Amino acid sequence: MAEAHITLSPKVTHEQQTDIDSECEITEVDDENVNENKSQEMIQDIPARDREEIENITRTFVELQENYRLIEKIGEGTFSSVYKAEDLHYGRYINDWDIQSEVLKESSFGKEKIPVNEDSRKPKYVAIKKIYATSSPARIYNELEILYLLRGSSVIAPLITALRNEDQVLVVLPYYEHTDFRQYYSTFSYRDMSIYFRCLFQAMQQTQTLGIIHRDIKPSNFLFDVRTKHGVLVDFGLAERYDGRQQSHSCRCTNSNAAELAHDFSIAQETSLGYIKNDTRPSKRANRAGTRGFRAPEVLFKCSSQSPKVDIWSAGVILLSFLTKRFPMFNSKDDVDALMEIACIFGKSEMRQCAALHGCTFETNVSTLTEKRVNFRKLILWASCGSASIYKEKLRHKPSQEERLCLDFLEKCLELDCNKRISAEEALDHDFLYLDNLAYEKKDDDTAFDNSFGETSFEKDEDLTAKHLSHILDFKEQEETDEPTSLSKRKRSIDEILPNDALQDGA
């Protein structure tokens, strides 16, 4: 099958091209030879395995050689690999997606557009995502369609173009300069976090407005540049459509009296624990997509009526990593371990209520788990302080206004009941996301702080608390795959990349 390609982005007009050529002083003397020499030099510097992959991709896609020069592999995941490439014909197209040509810089006075004085002849980069052939046509089609719908946003990586050769699909996305999460998560101030999450929730609000659940919110999928204080949401490989009006009502959580029903259900379960012998009921099925450690409770309990609130929970886990200076915060191997890690913080009582909300039962004989939840502030201080003396000293001080707003925002994001969890739109009205624009007194505010998240106290039972939290607070770094993005042009018809017959064959 021949390569499928249709260019949708407008080409530069003759007058515009004349201006571009004049401004950029473009010269095309021995261009092909220069590009070939550069390509040979770059290929020699990369690992043999990656070099072989790049050569195979280049041979498979003829048009790729004409428009891009693959440089290196920058990411690898379950369903795809990502490569950095140079866009050889950047100046020939209108690149309205290129937000890095005018960087947005955050300041205490709000957003200021800071023009970047770059050499116009400096290489422009893109990220080329190779989707593995094991992905179904329906999954690939869904990702391309969602990327196309989300075009035009400064906080979401858009689709530039896509190529297909038989069962091989390449997606071309912008490449964004960004800082590795591990380099800054332990040093960010409250105001830095405020800017980070304002940008993230702006992206989430835009996806949710279009009825899209990202399903894989995590640091490696939000490319944040510490220098410009701007971030971009990427990787919609697990994203799906959501329509609240057509939402399945098979789960108890969608009932208007869900909380009361869950309470009654949990009480009834206490007197009838056990398994039904020769149970003929069908197994519970639900979308469980996502990255371990970032999946919401309703995903772990296999709720069949999941909403965009699953993304809010994931964002809350990222915030908890910032505050505790622990990453990854959760590091479970399976769903059962994941529920136990959450129970270490929220306690058995609230976990039973949450399970009942989705028609499940939560019971455990782990003696170190407490009935009531751990106070968020105490948890954060305990995890981030280097010693017990420092912890007790900080605990004696009243929290600042910034800290109170941050804790309130955290509590609203990490709400076990998905019906009560804050939405992206509501989050954007929260004062925590605007700390850089608000004036605060340096001294601690004397207003009373609501410390009633739970009565589990580090002073009362510090040894027990440390014991049942130790397995989630003593982490080794989890290897994550960044799947960044780069810079280029040209959008294609999704139907041309994956025609209807291919979609039906893979359905």
Curated annotation (Swiss-Prot):
Nucleotidyltransferase in keyword set: no
Modified positions (Phosphothreonine) in chain numbering: T291
Active-site annotation: D216 (proton acceptor)
InterPro entries hit by this protein: Kinase-like_dom_sf (IPR011009), Prot_kinase_dom (IPR000719), Ser/Thr_kinase_AS (IPR008271)
Localization per record: Nucleus
EC top class named in words: transferase
Post-translational modification: Autophosphorylated. Phosphorylated by cds1 in vitro.
Catalysed conversion reaction: L-seryl-[protein] + ATP = O-phospho-L-seryl-[protein] + ADP + H(+); L-threonyl-[protein] + ATP = O-phospho-L-threonyl-[protein] + ADP + H(+)
Region (Disordered) residue spans: 475-507
Listed Pfam families: Pkinase
Regulation of protein activity: Phosphorylation of exogenous substrates activated by Dfp1.
Keyword Disulfide bond: no
EC number: 2.7.11.1
Domain named Protein kinase: residues: 68-433
Binding sites annotated in the UniProt record for ATP: I74, G75, E76, G77, T78, F79, S80, S81, V82, K129
BP GO annotations: cell division; DNA replication checkpoint signaling; DNA replication initiation; double-strand break repair via break-induced replication; G1/S transition of mitotic cell cycle; mitotic DNA replication checkpoint signaling; mitotic intra-S DNA damage checkpoint signaling; positive regulation of DNA repair
Gene3D superfamilies with a match to the protein in the record: Phosphorylase Kinase, domain 1, Transferase(Phosphotransferase) domain 1
Stated role: Required for G1/S transition. Plays a role in DNA replication checkpoint signaling through regulating rad3 and cds1. Involved in the maintenance of mitotic chromosome structures during S phase through regulating the function of rad21. Required for initiation of mitotic DNA replication through phosphorylating mcm2/cdc19. Required for genome integrity.
Protein name: Cell cycle serine/threonine-protein kinase hsk1
Organism: Schizosaccharomyces pombe (strain 972 / ATCC 24843) (Fission yeast)
